[in-house]
């Protein structure tokens, strides 16, 4: 058995192979790419003829080099860069480092402390596609918020009443209206019927368009502050550019959402996930993508809670004890469970009871929601492990049994 450390980068990778005694038996660099990966595999086979004879340590989970070695059947283990930094001090206190030395540190850390590191596993086809799509959606939503904020700032400067005409700046009717009439002077002269036709063109129904047109016309007739002429002349071009960006983002979001629906439909955990309170068609794909279809890759529910960030971190020394918020986790799973908990306390009896109990004891809103999220994680782990959908009646009856026997 040999242990291999890979200090990876975008352009090249440093390898170090150590034997079971910690002796460095081979070190080399390869360029990033298929040819380089195959060279590395060929050199490793001289010391580990079978992939089962080698353990590999690396500081990334998402990379082509990870995909390559997982596909060949190697056992890959992820080390957090913070962990590697601590292991580096075990060998050198001077702080000196190099790519080759870091590769050796990774290999030796895996040799001595393998039990501390999580083994990486290739995601199933459904989860991998969903992960790419849901993360793409997340990025588009962030871009949408950024563009909306820029639009808000621009309109406040020269056309503030536009912010009061619609419920938000990410609506088709807003884009259609402001592209056609980007200044107050142009919009003020519009009749109710003209505004109505613009809103209809944007896709609003006859009744809604008529009601909105009257409201918009009324607000446009109110006295407004007059900005400098140069400001009014310059800003419309910037606003139109932002509006076109917003339209592009909305179109991309629609396309990505359709692909998410198509790929999520066949995911093996879809029905199980959506049986839980608070988890529906929006949060389900995120959890399916980030957790994968095989829940057994988490050793137990405690490991899953740490992964999701719902379990706190305890610092204890002598008389000192402090419970802290867990920051090292999968933020997407944490956010999904936070939103699911918010939904669950409005629709699920036990979730509401738990939330109200903790709030009455003086616990904060966030602390109470995390307690609900912890319960959801326990249920999620159980139903995915047993392949049985969640049943609220069964859950409540089991709680009654446990409270009676305890």
What are these regions (language model features)?
Residues 1-406:
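A detector of single, family-specific signature residues
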């Amino acid at each position: 058995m040999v242990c291999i450390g890979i200090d990876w980068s975008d352009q090249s990778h440093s390898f170090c192979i150590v034997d079971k005694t910690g002796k460095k038996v081979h070190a080399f660099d390869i360029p990033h790419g298929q040819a380089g990966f195959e060279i590395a595999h060929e050199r490793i086979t001289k010391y580990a003829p079978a992939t089962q004879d080698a353990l590999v340590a690396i500081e990334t989970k998402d990379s082509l080099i990870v995909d390559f070695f997982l596909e060949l059947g190697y056992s890959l283990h992820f080390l957090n860069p913070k962990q590697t930094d601590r292991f580096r001090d075990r060998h050198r206190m001077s702080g000196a480092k190099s790519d080759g030395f870091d590769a050796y540190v990774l290999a030796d850390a895996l040799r001595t402390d393998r039990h501390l590191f999580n083994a990486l596993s290739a995601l199933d086809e459904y989860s991998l596609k969903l992960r790419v799509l849901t993360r793409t959606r997340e990025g588009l939503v962030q871009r949408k918020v950024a563009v909306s904020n820029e639009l808000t700032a621009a309109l406040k400067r020269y056309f503030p009443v536009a912010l009061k005409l619609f419920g938000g700046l990410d609506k088709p009717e807003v884009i259609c209206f402001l592209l056609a009439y980007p200044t107050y002077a142009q919009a003020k002269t519009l009749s109710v019927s003209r505004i109505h036709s613009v809103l209809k063109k944007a896709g609003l129904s006859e009744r809604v368009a008529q009601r909105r047109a009257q409201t918009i016309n009324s607000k446009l007739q109110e006295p407004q502050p007059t900005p400098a002429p140069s400001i009014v002349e310059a800003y419309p071009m910037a606003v139109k550019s932002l509006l076109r960006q917003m339209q592009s983002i909305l179109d991309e979001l629609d396309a990505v959402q359709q692909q998410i629906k198509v790929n999520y439909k066949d995911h093996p955990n879809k029905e199980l996930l959506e049986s839980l309170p608070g988890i529906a068609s929006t949060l389900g794909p995120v959890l399916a993508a980030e957790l994968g279809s095989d829940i057994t890759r988490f050793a137990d529910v405690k490991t899953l809670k740490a992964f999701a960030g719902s379990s706190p971190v305890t610092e204890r020394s002598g008389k000192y004890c402090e419970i802290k918020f867990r920051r090292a986790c999968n933020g997407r799973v944490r956010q999904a469970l936070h939103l699911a908990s918010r939904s669950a306390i409005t629709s699920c009896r036990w979730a509401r009871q738990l939330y109200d109990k903790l709030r009455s004891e003086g616990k904060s809103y966030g602390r109470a929601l995390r307690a609900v999220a912890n319960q959801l994680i326990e249920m999620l782990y159980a139903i995915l492990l047993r392949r049985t959908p969640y049943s609220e009646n069964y859950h409540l009856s089991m709680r009654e049994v446990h409270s009676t026997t305890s």
